[in-house]
């Protein structure tokens, strides 16, 4: 409903329709569904299982390059909390160092808007056609344009791939075997294969962002920092992505609640056996 209303609002602004009919409609009630996420140590198991996932190999690309591609894409999903379209659109020029801190200046995304003759793209987005129904566009909100710090190790592995494959500043770091943009269906296939190889529960790719939001909460990161990393416009949205695990809740509650009982004061109960 929200997406439809946004499109109709824009159509009204561009005078394509006289009025947005959604204004007179009560939004449907949507029951939230809980997103299952991996435990803190399981993403590493998933990434390490990529070479053993048993996926079908297609195209001329070397197996090591294909495996590396998925391992890096999965790591970016967890470590940087990047959206699927942001990871698929990643180019070397977005890799920056600020104050000596390596990171990604998220400036673009890949989205499906249809073939050029059929595409309907919101006026506030700058868009460039890439391939088929895929378009390279600016982020959907101002907050989505953000700098996300990454580890030195991840930074070095990204640049090693860029240099080894001769990827230009404005070329996609991740492509399929034909050099075209990664498709979500292909990533989902390899993701599920890696989950199975690692013996992990079935979770969605999008759950990686929920995992990132949850881990930042577990680390007691300030709300403004959490929303900045996630690219959200409000903390309420970030909280929607956050899942407090039992261990962290127990630790926080243990810090907050003082001891209410002296364990040294033990009452011994006498057990009386009844005889028939």
Describe the role of every protein-language-model region:
Residues 48-56, 60-61, 99, 110-145, ...:
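C-terminal secondary-structure termini that scaffold catalytic or DNA-interacting sites
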Residues 2, 23, 44, 156, ...:
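Surface-exposed alpha-helical interface segments used for non-catalytic interactions
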Residues 9-18, 160-163:
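Arg/Lys-rich amphipathic alpha helix in sigma70-family domain 2
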Residues 13, 17-90, 97-101, 135, ...:
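Basic, Lys/Arg- and aromatic-enriched nucleic-acid-binding interface segment
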Residues 94-103, 201-202, 221-240, 264:
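Short, polar N-cap/turn motifs at the start of nucleic acid-interacting alpha helices
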Residues 15, 36-37, 148, 180, ...:
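Helix-turn-helix-type domain boundary/helix-start signal
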Residues 1-10, 25, 150:
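Non-catalytic DNA-binding core/recognition domains of DNA-processing enzymes
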Residues 48-70, 80, 148, 156, ...:
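Short, basic (Lys/Arg/His-rich) helix/loop patches that form interaction surfaces
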